[in-house]
Amino acid sequence: MPSVGVKLYSVFFKFLLKHRLQNRIQSSGDESSSDPFGVTTRPEESVAAPNPLFTDGVATKDIHIDPLTSLSVRIFLPESALTPLEPSTSACVYSGKARTLNNIAGSDLLSRRNSLGSSNSLLSHKVESRRNSYGYTTGSSSPEAGSSDVYRGYAPSSSGGNSRKLPVMLQFHGGGWVSGSNDSVANDFFCRRMAKHCDIIVLAVGYRLAPENRYPAACEDGFKVLKWLGKQANLAECNKSMGNSRRPGGEVKKSEVNKHIVDAFGASLVEPWLANHADPSRCVLLGVSCGANIADYVARKAIEVGQNLDPVKVVAQVLMYPFFIGSVPTQSEIKQANSYFYDKPMCILAWKLFLPEEEFSLDHQAANPLVPGRSPPLKFMPPTLTIVAEHDWMRDRAIAYSEELRKVNVDAPVLEYKDAVHEFATLDMLLRTPQAQACAEDIAIWAKKYISLRGHEFSY
């Protein structure tokens, strides 16, 4: 059984959640509450500021990718992306030049898991001055102290010739459609953990919340980010091609290259972290709670559009305690309807806020993954890892979905965690528990099967 602390926190959590849901329902009755631009976080949410330095092994930055909506992403770039192609040395960027750190046994600096603790504190102290000088744009080797007009974050080398390419993970946070955010303290911690364990670039998606934006806004936002990732890859390739092209008498000027890119793709900027370090042909989707429903939607849309997404390829997805429901209750829905943190009545309220009133049904295609007529056929779905908790009333439907995938020969294992509750690996209070740590390691072990073997991954 969960600990006494978890039980007490669950009571407090459910009280606050019920109060917030009721307030949202009251406000949703006012037509003025509809906002096409949308919101991606709530005032009560504790957020973590982005940090473009590798202070704990992962650098982060926020990008607003759609001028018409509030859709945004937070990029989590692990320090392992700076490892040069030569395995004998590791690279740091110092005053715009590459310097090497030799004779570091076991490459402790780049250890993903050790960087969660403080075992590297002495070494990190020695290189802190170098990390603070990442990406100075003034051209000077030591900008004035206290200068506020100088970017001190990581900036890849303009040549990009020695860049290491990492797979990409699109992460969709939970929160019952109406709360949560990609930059919350809890989600920031979880994404940093996944970036280190999986050795992967994480894009945490800040999708629009309900009731200001109802279905399919959040799901479409998820797919829009996948298309944006493909556009970034094409922009980077175009930039590289134009930069390498020559004309009689000299090289093409950078300004002229940028003009050609703008003419071809519109006024979109190439994201340097992704251009230098991302391999979109190895893309994993990971969704937490209702975010798992978004991940499943994005996977289905990716199958429908097929090669139009090139070079992006979804090679696997991870569904963490998905927010599935249906009109016919399962065994766990009957026995554990009043379980910890998210009980069934409150989740139904959340679905009423998310689905348009005229479309509300517990068998809506966004709610029930096993309704007849849902496309595409399950046999085309990517390998799917499902994480479930013992004390979660949504468990049985997630397991049933996984069983249907296995019937059509999709690799779809289920990992069930004993004495665990919904969001046991992502909720703020539970993030540092042994179960949460073990879950992250299990996800990394499974995901690496599909992101490490080039040429053997799933493709549509």
Swiss-Prot record:
Pfam families in UniProt: Abhydrolase_3
Region annotated Disordered, chain positions: 26-52, 132-161
SUPFAM superfamilies cross-referenced by the UniProt entry: alpha/beta-Hydrolases
Official protein name in the record: Probable carboxylesterase 11
Root EC class: hydrolase
Family named by the database record: Belongs to the 'GDXG' lipolytic enzyme family.
Source organism of the structure: Arabidopsis thaliana (Mouse-ear cress)
Tissue: Expressed in roots, leaves, stems, flowers and siliques.
Source taxonomy: Eukaryota, Viridiplantae, Streptophyta, Embryophyta, Tracheophyta
Active site as annotated: 289, 392, 422
Keyword field: Hydrolase, Serine esterase
Compositional bias per record (Polar residues), positions renumbered to this chain: 26-35, 132-145
Reactions that this protein is recorded to catalyse: a carboxylic ester + H2O = an alcohol + a carboxylate + H(+)
Residues making up the signal peptide according to the UniProt record: none
Gene3D superfamilies: alpha/beta hydrolase
Positions of short motif Involved in the stabilization of the negatively charged intermediate by the formation of the oxyanion hole: 173-175
GO molecular function, one term: carboxylesterase activity
Known role: Carboxylesterase acting on esters with varying acyl chain length.
Enzyme Commission number, as recorded: 3.1.1.1
Domain of life: Eukaryota
Gene: CXE11
